[in-house]
Regions:
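Extracellular glycan-modifying ectodomains
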Residues: 1-390
Length: 390
């Protein structure tokens, strides 16, 4: 046997090595011909793009290679399938009770793994509490605060045994005291949600409450303010199946049960304003309450109020005006207010860069409602604007 034949024979003595080499070579070639994606709809996140070679001189080699490593990770061919495979191995083969930072609970419920406040939240939570106090003091008797607990606080028995979770109750108790001491009303929804926990009040695969959970909280607000609540039986109920939320995007468990979105067929108009300064804008685009085109894409919850706009106005069927200062928990809540108010103005500080005093002065609101999940409240870097005078 000549030397060439011996070398060839020795190579084929390592079939596993050959298989791995061919696999990674094929993956490399597939990456070369697969177009980069700007956005992952499944993960609801922006994906890294190829860093410019100019970064070498501008930022140094270390930053360039860090950016390039992240780019390769985000743009690997079949990324969604690799994530799903990893989750399957972790949950089915290794029998883990968490995947992608999500705790896998009973009744197919998913919970975020939140063991305590992170360092940024230890600074943000006091700032946002102070903002609430300042708002309540400037508008005594008008400010209503509703902070919604996470599903894990209502369903602790469904959380995997021994999983340490943030004790939201102690923070909510302190916030209730602070709001009331400052002249506001704290609308505590914890007991109401607990009373209805046998119903479908939180999504299994998403961090939001359902329209049913929001309705029970809305009824509590009506009781607090002496209002007659929206009557669901007087309206046509619509549903959209096949909703996989943010928890599923992280966990990617193969046997996850999809959620169902429920909403009511309401004819009310929604005007989304172009905001360029404090106060009431003049220009806006008028549409309906729901962006039903979103029901055909992955993030179906974004259909409520057309997402998180900086300032919008819902035309209601009642009297008076209310300003809702909110995160996305309010998106499925606000339509119920059409039964009570003529104008429901909605502010989301993620896209509204001003204080509230000019807007409030322009519109002379009867009530203000601050509606956030506690998870968002403790981490929102923009809510401080609610406390800024002027």
């Amino acid at each position: 046997m000549d030397k060439h034949s011996k070398r060839s024979a020795s190579i084929f003595r390592y079939p596993v090595l050959i298989a791995f080499t061919l696999f990674f070579a094929g993956l490399f070639l597939l990456d070369l011909v697969t177009p980069d994606r700007a956005y992952s709809e499944l993960e609801n996140t922006t994906l890294s793009q190829r860093p410019s070679l100019s970064s070498v001189s501008a930022d140094g080699l270390n930053k360039f290679f860090t950016a390039y490593t992240k780019y390769v990770k985000d743009q690997v061919a079949g990324r969604d399938n690799w994530i799903a495979l990893q989750s399957t191995v972790e949950t089915k083969v290794m029998q883990k009770e968490q995947s992608g930072g999500i705790l896998l609970g009973k009744q197919q419920m998913m919970f975020p793994r939140t063991y305590g406040l992170v360092s940024s939240e230890t600074r943000t939570l006091p700032k946002n509490t102070a903002a609430l106090e300042a708002l309540c003091q400037r508008y005594p008797g008008k400010v209503n605060v509703m902070l919604v607990p996470a599903a894990s606080a209502i369903y602790p028995e469904s959380v995997p045994a021994g999983a340490p979770l943030l004790d939201e109750d102690c923070y909510l108790d302190s916030l209730s005291d602070a709001v009331q001491a400052a002249g506001g009303r704290f609308v505590d929804v914890r007991q109401t949600l607990t009373d209805h926990k046998d119903e479908y009040i939180y999504y299994r695969t998403d961090h939001h409450w359902t329209s049913t959970g929001a309705y029970y909280a809305y009824k509590l607000l009506c009781d607090t303010l002496g209002l007659t609540p929206f009557d669901p039986s007087a309206h046509t109920v619509l549903t959209a199946d096949g909703f996989y939320g943010t928890h599923y995007s992280k966990a990617r468990t193969p046997d996850a049960e999809p959620d169902t979105i429920t909403y009511y067929d309401l004819p009310n108009e929604l005007t989304i304003y172009s905001v360029s300064g404090p106060g009431q804008p003049a220009d806006g685009e008028t549409t309906g309450l729901y962006d039903t085109a979103k029901l055909d894409v992955y993030d179906k919850y974004a259909m409520f109020l057309h997402g998180n706009n900086g300032l919008s106005r819902i035309k209601g069927d009642g009297t008076g005006r209310i300003l809702v200062i909110k995160d996305s928990y309010a998106n499925c809540f606000a339509p119920y207010l059409t039964a009570n108010y003529a104008d429901i103005d909605v502010v989301d500080f993620r896209n509204y860069n001003y204080g509230l005093d000019k807007l409030i002065a322009d519109n002379d609101y009867d009530q203000l409602l601050v509606l956030y999940s506690f998870d968002s409240f403790k981490s929102d870097p923009y809510l401080y604007r609610a406390g800024v005078a002027g």
